[in-house]
């Protein structure tokens, strides 16, 4: 009798089983990592470590049940754990009454009386260093009919592909008001990009004087800041300004979480811009905000008559701000060499 030949079907089935087991294990590890990171950013002290141990023990139990052939039990434990984790995730709500860091203690709110916008909690800090400053929150009045310009500011530090973005509105009397969507840190917190995926921070809309919020970045933090004049019609300028005020009041009434991808300084600008101009397309440069000026240049929102590199070079203001005569108002100093921004 001849020898029994190889049984490829059995080997193939065995291979499929191995791959299915590996995929299951990978899924368990990813789920455990996501839940563990949520615990890491939501809990403090002994509770954090207790629940991290629970997550690890549950993942090991699921894998052990699978490895010993008790697949139904493994799936049941995994499903129950996922349902429990999702249920907890849905209970994590944004709050508006935490012990906030001084620079985000208040979000701006607004009310309209005729052509006048009255803004409460406009920030006007005097920064001497990152930790040494004089706090000042003001109520200001702006004549909406005198809106004369809109500038986009970008601020980069370590990675040129990632920028913080701000929008500054100019008025015919020489006043400027800058809006910035920021994480709302508590006093003991520091920023974490990863934490922004796990409901770690609330979102706040800050309205501030340029001599506060831009000078902090140019002169105190020494970041690379650029200022781009946007080509908007008077109607678009007004609509964008009003959209910011509406967003500010909305956040005051209904707090929201900051999200590293979907609700950050740049995506908030994009969402509001789409309310003004619904046809503007989504683009990868909205997420990699350091390239936002390229996107705006391509769509004619900035000065399309200049090559992009020249536009970028002309827009940089940090050196001008640092070298300016302190007697010259900050907003004039950073625009001094660019008549189009006066």
Predicted regions and their residues:
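Short, Lys/Arg-rich, polar N-terminal cytosolic tail immediately upstream
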Residues: 1-14
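Glycine-rich catalytic cores of cysteine/serine-nucleophile enzymes that process amide/ester linkages
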Residues: 117, 128-225
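Alpha-helical transmembrane signal-anchor/signal-peptide segments
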Residues: 94-113
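Acidic, Ser/Thr-rich low-complexity segments on the non-lumenal side of membrane proteins
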Residues: 118-124
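Activation targets extended, charge/polar-rich intrinsically disordered C-terminal tails
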Residues: 13-62, 246-342
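Cytosolic-side transmembrane helix boundary signature
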Residues: 52-78
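Internal/C-terminal transmembrane anchor helices
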Residues: 71-94
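Soluble catalytic domains of enzymes that build or remodel membrane lipids, polysaccharides, and related
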Residues: 198-275
